[in-house]
């Protein structure tokens, strides 16, 4: 790649090395509390009607108990959860929202629960809990301490008044109930001032139906599902950004062609100049043109930056959580590369994570988008699930999806095949979230 820059080489040599996929973040304290390092923790978003994140359900599982059915049901699990809050700050997972945490019956009366911060903690009472006097008393105490209570997987219309009088939220599993049941539950409990949460919402149609029924909160992967439309319906900036992405990911980068495409997108030009002139580079003279900026960036940095900068426009009509999820996947994939012996493929793994939700952003089949961008081979195979399941890139992508879903048994099997230590995975996940939060706030992602 020939340089287009007019900034002097000596000036460039004096600038600090900083890459979008290697930000200057504080790593987790070392050593981290052993109890924390031995637990997996994942998050699943809960949305309001405007598709803003209301909170996250946190999923915990001790690493050593990958195959244990009741690993989350013991008092020891509460110790792990409270240690996690105290020693590492699980609030870093919450982005200023609320934590929904599952409580089986034996944890409701455990006084260690009071070490969890009442503000922003929603205690989910599992469906296996029976509303006996001890449970009612424990729930009343938790409520008096300031905790918000929610009933999980609830389907009772009668006989639970003493417990439902204490809760603020009722979760209804849309995979385990009929439409009639969903409506009846919403009608009965909304009338009593209880907020209804529709769980396991998988399509945008289900989301709209739940809204019409009176549900206020929604959990599931519906926000990451594409609503397929015809190619000609993709207009304006999205189409322009797709052209830039396609040019950036050609095997041979043509800077003059890329410069011409970027010039057509005023917002992308502005983002590029803000990025290259950020204080972290420390240029003596400001960079004033696209040509200069591209000349100062390496090929991989150009590709990564354009991919990142394109996300807000491609997902402009989608929930912010879609962008956050793509960013977490990208960084998580890249961090796992080293531990899986794939350091030489970390840029490809970063791209796989970043592009894994392009179909939802553009409402087009992913295979069609990847073909247009010219992405083939094991990168496309990993994204489409069309290659051998034992391909390393596909395995890492599968591990990340398993982590997101809290499929701990599958995760442990995949980690073993990749020879990735189980106890490092949560560290990498939290680092990926911290990085995504930083990038999300950077000016390169502003509209």
Residue map of PLM features:
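Amphipathic alpha-helical segments in well-ordered regions
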Residues: 80, 84-88, 146, 357, ...
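Conserved alpha-helical "signature site"
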Residues: 3, 180, 202-447
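Short, well-ordered alpha-helical scaffold segments within catalytic/effector domains
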Residues: 78, 82, 132, 136, ...
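Coupling/switch/interface segments within P-loop NTPase motor domains and analogous charged loops
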Residues: 1-9
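Long, contiguous hydrophobic alpha-helical segments, chiefly transmembrane helices and signal peptides
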Residues: 40-47, 53-60, 80-81, 99-103, ...
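The catalytic core of metal-dependent phosphodiesterases that act on cyclic dinucleotides
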Residues: 112-223, 345-348
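Bacterial c-di-GMP phosphodiesterase EAL domain
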Residues: 4, 15-120, 127-130, 134, ...
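A generic secondary-structure signal
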Residues: 87-91, 141, 188, 209, ...
């Amino acid at each position: 790649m020939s340089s287009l820059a007019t900034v002097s080489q000596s000036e460039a040599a004096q600038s600090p090395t900083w890459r979008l996929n290697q930000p200057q973040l504080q790593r987790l304290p070392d050593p981290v509390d052993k109890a924390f390092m031995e637990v997996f923790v994942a998050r699943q978003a809960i949305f309001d009607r405007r598709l803003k994140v209301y909170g996250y359900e946190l999923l915990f599982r001790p690493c050593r108990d990958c195959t244990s059915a009741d690993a989350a049901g013991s008092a020891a699990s509460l110790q792990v959860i409270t240690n996690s809050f105290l020693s590492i700050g699980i609030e870093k997972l919450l982005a200023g929202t609320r934590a929904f945490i599952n409580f089986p019956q034996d944890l409701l009366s455990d006084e260690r629960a009071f070490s969890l911060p009442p503000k922003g903690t929603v205690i989910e009472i599992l469906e296996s809990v029976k509303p006996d006097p001890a449970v009612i008393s424990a729930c009343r105490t938790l409520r008096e301490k300031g905790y918000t209570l929610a009933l999980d997987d609830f389907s009772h219309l009668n006989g639970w008044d003493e417990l439902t009088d204490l809760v603020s939220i009722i979760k209804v599993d849309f995979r385990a109930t009929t439409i009639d049941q969903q409506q009846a539950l919403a009608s009965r409990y909304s009338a009593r001032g209880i907020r209804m949460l529709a769980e396991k919402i998988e399509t945008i149609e289900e989301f709209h139906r739940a809204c019409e029924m009176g549900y206020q909160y929604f959990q599931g992967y519906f926000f990451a599902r594409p609503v397929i439309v015809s190619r000609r319906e993709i207009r304006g900036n999205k189409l322009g950004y797709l052209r830039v992405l396609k040019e950036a990911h050609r095997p041979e980068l043509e800077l003059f062609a890329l410069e011409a495409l970027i010039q057509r997108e005023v917002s992308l030009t502005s983002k590029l100049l803000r990025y290259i002139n950020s204080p972290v580079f420390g240029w003596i003279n400001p960079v004033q043109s696209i040509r200069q900026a591209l000349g100062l960036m390496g090929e991989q940095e150009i590709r990564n930056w354009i991919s990142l900068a394109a996300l807000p426009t491609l997902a402009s009509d989608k929930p912010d959580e879609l962008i956050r999820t793509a960013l977490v996947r990208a960084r998580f994939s890249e961090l796992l590369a080293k531990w899986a012996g794939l350091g030489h493929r970390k840029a490809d793994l970063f791209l796989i994570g970043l592009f894994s939700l392009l179909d939802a952003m553009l409402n087009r089949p992913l295979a069609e988008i990847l073909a247009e961008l010219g992405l083939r081979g094991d990168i496309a195979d990993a994204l489409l699930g069309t290659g051998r399941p034992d391909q390393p890139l596909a395995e890492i992508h599968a591990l990340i999806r398993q982590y997101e879903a809290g499929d701990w048994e599958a995760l442990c099997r995949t980690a073993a095949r990749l020879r990735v230590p189980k106890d490092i995975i949560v560290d990498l996940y939290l680092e990926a979230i911290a990085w995504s939060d930083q990038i999300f706030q950077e000016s390169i992602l502003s509209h």
